[in-house]
Amino acid sequence: MFRIIAVSMMCLGLAGTAGAQDAQVVLGQKVYAAQKCAICHSIGETGNKKGPLDGVGTKLTALELHAWMVDAKGMTTKTKSTRKPLMRDYKLPKEDVDALVAYMLTLKATPKK
């Protein structure tokens, strides 16, 4: 009986975590739209093709994505990126940056046309 209760509680805990992660991804999508990221970036067929984000969730880690959002100039130097124009450093609240990172990590592959 104890084992059933323990497993049930673990499942409930995991469901709560997944729900919180889903909420953070949804917030990330809203921040992406509100900050007008599509002016410079694209996801699928939407946005500026010069800054594609398709598959970014498999190319960069959460720490790298975070660094690009808060210190783009530093990351440009660190990675020797030659992209023009350079992404500017955004002064977003930590919660918004975390949500954007969560959303970017879901972008695993180029959407099918």
Predicted regions and their residues:
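Bacterial N-terminal signal peptides
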Residues: 5-15
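Axial heme c-ligation environment in periplasmic c-type cytochrome domains
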Residues: 48-57, 71-99, 104-107, 112
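Electrostatic cytochrome c docking/interface patches
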Residues: 14-33
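Gly/Gly-Pro-rich "capping" loops immediately C-terminal to redox-active cysteine motifs
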Residues: 25-29, 39-71, 88-89
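Hydrophobic packing within well-folded, soluble alpha/beta domains
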Residues: 37-40, 100
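Short pre-active-site segment immediately N-terminal to redox-active cysteine/selenocysteine motifs
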Residues: 33-36, 44, 86, 96
